[in-house]
Amino acid sequence: MDQNKQKALAAALGQIEKQFGKGSIMRLGDSKTMDIEAISTGSLSLDVALGIGGLPCGRIVEIYGPESSGKTTLTLQVIAEAQKKGKTCAFVDAEHALDPIYAAKLGVNVDDLLISQPDTGEQALEICDMLVRSNAVDVIIVDSVAALTPKAEIEGEMGDSHVGLQARLMSQALRKLTANIKNANCLCIFINQIRMKIGVMFGSPETTTGGNALKFYASVRLDIRRIGAIKEGDEVVGNETRVKVVKNKVAPPFKQAEFQIFYGAGISKEGELVDLGVKHKLIDKAGAWYSYNGEKIGQGKANVMKLFAENKAMAGEVEARLRELLLSGAVPVDDKAAPVEAEEFDAESEQEFE
C-alpha cells in the first residue's frame, strides 16, 4: 500500500475510533479475542463435537427437538457448568414449566439462578435484552421460542388469525440482541420446538417455530433426539440421546454426540468417560474387564461407572486426558452426522413479515 493510502487509512481509522469509541474497528490480527471462550455442555462427547469444548460465549445458540428429548435438561446442565465457573445465569421461563427441584438435582444452584416467567413474548425478549445490556449476566436461557406469544394474540379472541406476528417479533428482537450479546460476551440459548409443514413430499417436513430469523442469527444449532430407553429390568430409568450439530460457525459442523440421560440425575458423565476412554484407548477393555494404567478397575460398564462416581480424582484425570487429546485437534472428532437437507422456503406456510 502506498504512503498516501496508508495516511488516508490511518486518518479514517482515527476518525472512526474518535466518533464510535476504541475497538469499533481493528485489524483481525490485532484482536486479542481470536480464541472464543466456551462453556461446557456437561457432556464431554458434545463438547468435543462442538469443536471448541462447549457452547460459544457472545453468540446465540438454538437447541431444538421433539417433546421429552432432553432440551431443558441440556440447558440446565449448561447452567450448572457455568455456575461452577462463578458465572451469573438467567432462565426466562416462557413455558412456566421449570421444576426447581429437578434443576437442583442436576447441580444448578437454584438460589443464585435468576428466573423470569413473563406474560408476553415482547416482555420476555425485553427482559432478555435488559439483562444482556447490563453486562452482568453470562448465560441466558429462553424456554421456549414457541411460548413467546405476542401481546396482540394474548389480548385477542381465541380463534383470531395472527399470521407472521411471532416471526416478526423474533426478527426484530434478534436484530437488537445480536450486537449486544457479542459486546457483553453473553451466551444466549433459545430452546425451540418442532412443527410439521403440510404438503411436503420430499425432504423433511419438520421445521422450527418462530420464523426463519433464528436460523440465521444462531451461531450454533443443535438437534437433540431420544434414540432409545435405558432399562433396569422392566423399569425405564433414562434415555439414550443423540445430538447433531446442525449448524456451527465456530468449528466444522455436522458432528454428532451420543450420551445417556438418567431421570432425576441428568447426563451421565461417567458413562461417557468409559465409552470415550475405551474408544481412544485410554481405558483397556478385555472381555468384560476394564483396566486403567495397567490396573483392573471393574467388571462391566456399570461397575466402572460406579467407581468413577465415587473416585472423583480418577474420573477427573481421565476427563482431563480426554479433553487434551480430543480438543487439541490431534484426533478426529466423533462420527459425522448426515448433512442436513436444505429446507425449501415456503412463502405461504412460513412467512416472515418485517
Swiss-Prot record:
GO terms for cellular component: cytosol. InterPro entries: AAA+_ATPase, DNA_recomb/repair_RecA, DNA_recomb/repair_RecA_CS, P-loop_NTPase, RecA-like_C, RecA-like_N, RecA_ATP-bd, RecA_C_sf. PROSITE patterns: RECA_1, RECA_2, RECA_3. The keyword Ribosomal protein does not apply. It is found in: Cytoplasm. Keywords: ATP-binding, Cytoplasm, DNA damage, DNA recombination, DNA repair, DNA-binding, Nucleotide-binding, SOS response. It holds the Pfam family RecA. Coiled coil: none annotated. GO terms for biological process: DNA recombination; DNA repair; SOS response. It comes from the Bacteria. ATP binds at G65, P66, E67, S68, S69, G70, K71, T72. GO terms for molecular function: ATP binding; ATP hydrolysis activity; ATP-dependent DNA damage sensor activity; damaged DNA binding; single-stranded DNA binding. Can catalyze the hydrolysis of ATP in the presence of single-stranded DNA, the ATP-dependent uptake of single-stranded DNA by duplex DNA, and the ATP-dependent hybridization of homologous single-stranded DNAs. It interacts with LexA causing its activation and leading to its autocatalytic cleavage. Belongs to the RecA family. HAMAP family: RecA (MF_00268). This is Protein RecA. It comes from Aeromonas hydrophila subsp. hydrophila (strain ATCC 7966 / DSM 30187 / BCRC 13018 / CCUG 14551 / JCM 1027 / KCTC 2358 / NCIMB 9240 / NCTC 8049). The lineage of its organism: Bacteria, Pseudomonadati, Pseudomonadota, Gammaproteobacteria, Aeromonadales.
